[in-house]
Every structure is written in structure tokens, then in C-alpha cells.
Amino acid sequence: MQKLTTSIRKMQGRKILVIGDMVADVYLNGQIGRISREAPVLILQQVDEKIVPGGAANVVANTATLGGEVFAVGVLGDDKYAEKLRGLLETYGVHIEGLVTDESRPTISKVRVIAGGRATVSQQVVRIDNESKEPLAKKIETQLIAKLDAILPQVEGIVLSDYGSGTITENVKKLLLNYAQKNKIPSIVDSRYDVGRFGGVGYVKQNDTELAAFVGRDIDSMGALIESGSELLRKTNASAVLITRGENGMSLFERSGAVHHIPVSDKSEVFDVSGAGDTCVAAFILALTGKINPINAARISNYAAGIAVRKLGTSTVSFEELENATNK
């Protein structure tokens, strides 16, 4: 454990580019008042509204709180959520000059309505998503590429955080992967729906559900996991694939054929898995850019994700929390 504690100090100050679908995660808390006369629904009196970085913006935030110097690249609308996200990321010390404004589309938002009463436990009753399904306009893509051309020479690692909302176009993807390969810097993709299009990336992170969707079959045994993880590794031609498996920990597949299974760091007090994958990616890329080998990078990521799941909602993990966890 002492080795990991020493290793994580190499993560500090690493310059990381995070590009992807920036999301405003909104938590709207309300107190149950009465039944509406208009329809058989509850009337909630809004108590507060909390907005936190979600999607790729959560990767940005976690990379920053874990000690990285982060350059955020993505597309926001011209609305209150864009303004709030920019402000939040600035408070983390993030470089936000790579965020492009597209007035034709809203900032992606996921509004969770949470209802409760004085004698009841608060719980989420509905989620309202708002995003454009239209492809990025050519002029917006051109602006993104110009931002990348300016930022890439400054960074040591690249994260592609693809939530399926179209920020990482084919041209953007090619630019990033070619740059990473040419300059021999680590790149990692976490793609919710289409990881197969990222062939040539350095590293791949998926959860077990995403892996099952990619291979088109259930992963119901260790044999199925090994077969599926190896298939993803082969088809993406990555250096390694990291699969997060919930309460079963993580599995790292390396090009050498080695497979490492890492148990969860702490099975107690799992409150919420929201955003834990983003924390995992943030820790992994920081470790890789700190010249930490992939297996130890995965172990560090496992500790970081273990801290994240013990927090309610989308959240960040600090370097101090990670250091304390690896010291235990």
C-alpha cells in the first residue's frame, strides 16, 4: 500500500485535456404539499435547486479535485446552465477557454425532481432530460477543432468522455487519436453507447453493462467476462481495457494477455453510483500521465471510485481523500 501512496503523488499537476458531452446535473428538491385539482399528481413546493457538473463536466471536475490541471473542451448552449457550469468549473481552477457556445442548442441538462415531506424520506420521482439530438453544425465543429489545436500542445493526457450527445465528431476523434499516437501521450475513452468507433485509442474504460451491449451477449460468468473483455481489447486495439463491475470491483485487460481482477476497496456504505465511472477515468488518466503502470493506475482508480460511491449524487473526490484511502 505504501507504494500506491507514494505513486499517487505523481498524479499532481498533470495537464489533462477532457473533451466530451458537458452536462448540468440538476437536483430540484421539493416538499410535498397536496394533491393537484388539475390531475391526480402531487404538488411540490420547491425548496432548493442544486446544479453540479455532470457527464464530461464531472470528469473535468474530478480530474481537477484529484490534482490535475484540466483543459475542458465541449459545447454549451447560451443559457443559465451554461453560465452555471462555466462558473462551477472555474471554481475548480479549470481552463474553460475550450468551451464553445452554440446558441442553437441547449446546454445538456438532467433535472432530477426529488420529493419529500417532514415525516417521509426524500426520493427521486422523475428525471427530465433536455438536449439536442441534431449533429453539431460545421461551424461549431470548426471552432472545437481550433480550440483543440491551441490546447493540445500543452497537455500530457487526453480523455474522451462520450455520452452519446455528439460532441466528439468523427473529425474531432481522428484529430485527438492521431495526436495522442504521434506524440506518445496516453488517451482514454469512456463511451456509453459506441465504444467501437474509438479504435486506436490508448485505453478504454467501460462498465460491465456497456461491455455486454458491445459484445451483444450477457456477461454472467467469469469466463464470459474474460472473453468479452478480450474481444473489446482486440477490436479497439487498445493498450488496455478497464472494466468496472460494481460490487465486484474492476478488471483490467492488457494487450499482453494478462487479466487483473481488483476487488472493491470498501463494500460498506455504498450510497450512490452516479458519476463513479467519471471519477475512475479521472484517476486513471492522471496515474497514467504520472508514469504509473496500468495495473497500479487501475488500483488507484478503484480507490477513487470507492470514495465516490459513498457520496450522494454526482460528486467529486479530492486528492486528500484518495491519499487517506490508500494509506489505510
Q: PLM features: what roles do these ranges have?
A:
Residues L17-I19, R127, E156-V159, I188, ...:
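Structural motif
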Residues R34-V41, V201-T209, G249-G277, E323-T326:
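Flexible glycine/proline-rich, aromatic-decorated loop/lid segments
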